[in-house]
Amino acid sequence: MRLKELGEFGLIDLIKKTLESKVIGDDTAPVEYCSKKLLLTTDVLNEGVHFLRSYIPEAVGWKAISVNVSDVIANGGLPKWALISLNLPEDLEVSYVERFYIGVKRACEFYKCEVVGGNISKSEKIGISVFLVGETERFVGRDGARLGDSVFVSGTLGDSRAGLELLLMEKEEYEPFELALIQRHLRPTARIDYVKHIQKYANASMDISDGLVADANHLAQRSGVKIEILSEKLPLSNELKMYCEKYGKNPIEYALFGGEDYQLLFTHPKERWNPFLDMTEIGRVEEGEGVFVDGKKVEPKGWKHF
C-alpha cells in the first residue's frame, strides 16, 4: 500500500497503533512536568506545498510561528518557547533567511514567546519545521464535546482559500478586497485573544487548518458525537462575498471546505457565549456520528497531504 492510498489520517492512525500511544490525536501533546502543564506541538512548512519561494520571506516566518501558536491556543494554552529547524538550498540568498527571521521575530514579539534554538541542513527546497512549547492551566482537547453543546467558531471562514487562489492567478494588479484576502492567507493571526475563554469554558476545541467540515469531523470522531452545522450561520467576510460574486463562486463552499483559516472551532453551552469576542454559533452537538450541514451528512474534503 502506498501513502496516497492510506491517506494522511490513516497514516496517523497507523503511527498511533505502532507506538501504542494514548496521547497522539490532538492539536498539541499535553505533558505534565514539575507541576507544570506543558503543551508540545510541531508543524512543517515545505516549499511547493505550503508556500512558494516568491512569497514574502517575512510573511513565511510569521506564518511558521502562527500555525504552531494556533495549535497551543486551541488547547487552552499560551506559547512559550520555540525551536526552528531549516532545510535550505545552498544557492538561496542570505537575505531571504534574514528576512524570514525578521518575520519570526515579529510573530514572537506579538505572541510573547521566544525562539531558543534550532537546526540547519542543506536540501533541494526550503523546509521549515517549528517545535513549540506552551503552558496551560487546563488542557482542552477534541474529545470533550457534550450532547447539547453549541458549536462555535472564531472570526470568519474561507478567506485563506480565496487568498491562495488570488495569489495563484498572478495578476498584475489586485483590488483592495483581494489584497485583504491574500494577506489573510500569507499572514494568518492565531487567536490569542481566545485563550482565557477556551481555557475556562470550552468542552472541546481545535483550530481550523484543514477546513471546517474536515476538522469538525475530527472533533466529532474523537468525542463520539454528531455535529450539526447550519450554513446560514457561517460567518463570511465582506471580502469573501465580493470575491465570490466577482468570480462566480459559492462562499458557503469556501467556509465549509477552505483550509488554513487558523480560526478556532469549539463547543460549550450556549449561555457561555462571550459578546466581547467575534465568536459565532454555527450549530449543535447531537447524538450520532459525523458532520451534517442543514440536515444532510457531509463527507470531509478539506486539505489532505496524501
From Swiss-Prot:
HAMAP family: TMP_kinase (MF_02128). Mg(2+) 3 binds at D27, D71, D207. Mg(2+) 2 binds at D43, D71. It is an enzyme of class 2 (transferase). Mg(2+) 1 binds at T42, D43, N119. InterPro entries: PurM-like_C_sf, PurM-like_N, PurM-like_N_sf, ThiL-like. Mg(2+) 4 binds at D27, T41, D71. Mg(2+) 5 binds at D210. Its EC number is 2.7.4.16. Belongs to the thiamine-monophosphate kinase family. The gene is thiL. Catalyzes the ATP-dependent phosphorylation of thiamine-monophosphate (TMP) to form thiamine-pyrophosphate (TPP), the active form of vitamin B1. Substrate binds at H50, E260, W303. It catalyses: thiamine phosphate + ATP = thiamine diphosphate + ADP. GO terms for biological process: thiamine biosynthetic process; thiamine diphosphate biosynthetic process. NCBIfam families: thiL (TIGR01379). Pathway: Cofactor biosynthesis; thiamine diphosphate biosynthesis; thiamine diphosphate from thiamine phosphate: step 1/1. Homodimer. Keywords: ATP-binding, Disulfide bond, Kinase, Magnesium, Metal-binding, Nucleotide-binding, Thiamine biosynthesis, Transferase. GO terms for molecular function: ATP binding; magnesium ion binding; thiamine-phosphate kinase activity. Reaction mechanism of ThiL seems to utilize a direct, inline transfer of the gamma-phosphate of ATP to TMP rather than a phosphorylated enzyme intermediate. ATP binds at Y101, G118, N119, R142, S209. This is Thiamine-monophosphate kinase.
